[in-house]
């Protein structure tokens, strides 16, 4: 805006007979210098109040803007349409967009009101010192054409214009109070959403840490089981070797016994030796039977240990899947948190930049960035160990 020569007006341009479910339109009007005839024509149309409006549909709509010109060619209009959002967006993204739209509208209304107050104060201070040439101040607040700033219209003011000014000031004051209340409510809602997000993120992190500890314990148990299985297999191989050696001794004893029986059946010494060999053979058979029982028992234990090992590996795989899901959730929430912070920073910068008025207002729409989180490949299945009895 150039000093006191230009005004910015935020008005509602939808017709009076508009349906309840139709699209709301907000118009920003930039008005420059006008001639006396044009100002008189504008003053005749100043029958309705100018007000700033925040659409109640902004909670579930996105913004679309359009730059057009009015019929008389003296003002530039930016129409902001509120359209429906897609249903697959997250709830907190909708809340952020709603806050962004409401804060933008509130900031525009606040800036317009502040500019109006400054201009009125400056004109009052300047015109009160010059009592000979300037007796009254006329401020016309007109719905389609904004504020009148022509010096020729400031010298005379009828009583009807003063009444309209008072009503417009009261209306703007109430509107600003409502907008400030909505801004405070939106800030409180945003703070509560941030606290809930932090609590959820902390809970997910605790669950991930607990899952990591449980996974480490299961891995230690699996390593211990594998060591025990290796020791049992080593003992089993030793017992099998000993079993083969005992069988060879039994065969040798039987061959020697048969030779002794065939050579000299009447020799006492041979008989005693044969009896001794028979006793040894009986003892060896008992040992072989005992070793067979022990071997079968060890095989059963090995099978049980292998089953336990497979069950433990299955549990570890399920824990890995759970941890991976939790990591994906944490990554997704962190990405959303970063996006939320970026949008809030952008909103704050945009609010600060609105303090300096430009000659033309332009609307920009932003598409939220998408973050794709690739899912890591699933772990390979563990090998199956089988023990075959011989």
From Swiss-Prot:
It comes from the Eukaryota. GO terms for cellular component: cytoplasm; extracellular region; I band; RNA polymerase II, core complex. The gene is TUFT1. It is linked to Woolly hair-skin fragility syndrome: An autosomal recessive genodermatosis characterized by woolly hair texture with slow hair growth, and skin fragility present at birth or appearing in the neonatal period. Skin fragility then resolves or only persists as minor skin peeling, predominantly affecting the palms and soles. It comes from Homo sapiens (Human). Interacts with TFIP11. Involved in the structural organization of the epidermis. Involved in the mineralization and structural organization of enamel. This is Tuftelin. Residues 358-390 are annotated as: Disordered. Keywords: Biomineralization, Coiled coil, Palmoplantar keratoderma, Secreted. It is found in: Secreted. One of its GO terms (biological process) is odontogenesis. Residues 88-126, 162-351 form a coiled coil. One of its GO terms (molecular function) is structural constituent of skin epidermis. Expressed in the epidermis (at protein level). Present in the extracellular enamel and is mainly associated with the crystal component.
């Amino acid at each position: 805006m150039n000093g006191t020569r230009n005004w910015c007006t935020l008005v509602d341009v939808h017709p009076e007979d508009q349906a309840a479910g139709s699209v709301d339109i907000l118009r920003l009007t930039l008005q420059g210098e006008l001639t006396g005839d044009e100002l008189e024509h504008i003053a005749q149309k100043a029958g309705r109040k100018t007000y700033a409006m925040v659409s109640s549909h902004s909670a579930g709509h996105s913004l679309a803007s359009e730059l057009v010109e009015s019929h008389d060619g003296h003002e530039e209009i930016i129409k902001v349409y509120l359209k429906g959002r897609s249903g697959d967006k997250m709830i907190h993204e909708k809340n952020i967009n709603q806050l962004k739209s409401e804060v933008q509208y509130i900031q525009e209304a606040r800036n317009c009101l502040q500019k109006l107050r400054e201009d009125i104060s400056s004109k009052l201070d300047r015109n009160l010192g010059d009592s000979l040439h300037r007796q009254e101040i006329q401020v016309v607040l007109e719905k389609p054409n904004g504020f009148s700033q022509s010096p020729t219209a400031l010298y005379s003011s009828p009583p009807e214009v003063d009444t309209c000014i008072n009503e417009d000031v009261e209306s703007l004051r109430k509107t600003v109070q409502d907008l400030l209340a909505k801004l405070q409510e939106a800030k409180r809602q945003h703070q509560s959403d941030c606290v809930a997000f932090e609590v959820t993120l902390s809970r997910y992190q605790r669950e991930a840490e607990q899952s990591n500890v449980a996974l480490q314990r299961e891995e230690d148990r699996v390593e211990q089981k594998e060591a025990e299985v290796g020791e049992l297999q080593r003992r089993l191989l030793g017992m099998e070797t000993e079993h083969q050696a005992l069988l060879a001794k039994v065969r040798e004893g039987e061959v020697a016994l048969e030779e002794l029986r065939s050579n000299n059946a009447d020799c006492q010494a041979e008989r005693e030796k044969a009896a001794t060999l028979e006793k040894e053979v009986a003892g060896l058979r008992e040992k072989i039977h005992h070793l067979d029982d022990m071997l079968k028992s060890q095989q059963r234990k090995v099978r049980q240990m292998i089953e336990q090992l497979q069950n433990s590996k299955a549990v570890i795989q399920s824990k890995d899947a759970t941890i991976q899901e939790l990591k994906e959730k944490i990554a997704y929430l962190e990405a959303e948190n970063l996006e939320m912070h970026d949008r809030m920073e952008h909103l704050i910068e945009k609010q600060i930049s609105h303090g300096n008025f430009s000659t033309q207002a332009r609307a920009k729409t932003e598409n939220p960035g998408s973050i794709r989180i690739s899912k890591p490949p699933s772990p390979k299945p563990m090998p199956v160990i089988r023990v075959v009895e011989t």
